[in-house]
Amino acid sequence: MTVYLHDVNRGLGVFLLVVSFLLPGCSSSGGRRASVPVMVDATAQVVEQARQTWLQEHPNWGFHGRAAISQGRDGGSVRVEWEQHGRGYRIVLSAPMSRQSWVLSGSSSGPARLEGVGGWVRVGEVAEQVLFEATGWQVPMGLLPDWVRGRNSGGGDVQLDAEGRPHRVYQRGWQLRFLDWFPSSVGRPVLPRQIEASRGSARIRLIVDQWDELIP
């Protein structure tokens, strides 16, 4: 990814941000189209930088939401209850239609543990692999903690919206789109309300119903 940041008018504080990357094409070759320039003014840049700083300073968080996950013709919907304490996480997934539920817990620096209905347990070094072996779902667990909050962790190609927030992200073969945001509230900046991720035949659509700030 190449990012060119030019000072268009210092008096007006307007900047031209050109994020050069390739969008996934519709052809089987997976070609990409170059993005168009996005105008991000200085005020929006300051607000977004403050938001990124706030995210870094608040590592304990959680949310309640819903997710639709599909792999080709197979898929399902689950309720999601996510608690994140620094690098540690506890995620409850429940599928009302099939009456199945799973609890995924662990740390980004340690093994993952998945518990299912009936008391069975799977343990592995990579949370994504543990979840895939049990459910058949491809879910980028290592990327989601940053994605779900719209945090720029680096390592991916990013297209910004006019507010300076991430609009599209390409990382490790995944394409992520931010579709909707919660407005800012007292003591909390804007946070994603709806995101969509895809890689090959894998599709994930997440809707956050409520954000929670957890006490350390």
From Swiss-Prot:
It is a lipid-anchor. Disulfide bonds: none annotated. GO terms for biological process: lipoprotein localization to outer membrane; protein transport. One of its GO terms (cellular component) is cell outer membrane. A lipid is attached at residue 26 (S-diacylglycerol cysteine). Coiled coil: none annotated. InterPro entries: LolA/LolB/LppX, OM_lipoprot_LolB. It is found in: Cell outer membrane. HAMAP family: LolB. Monomer. This is Outer-membrane lipoprotein LolB. It comes from Xylella fastidiosa (strain 9a5c).
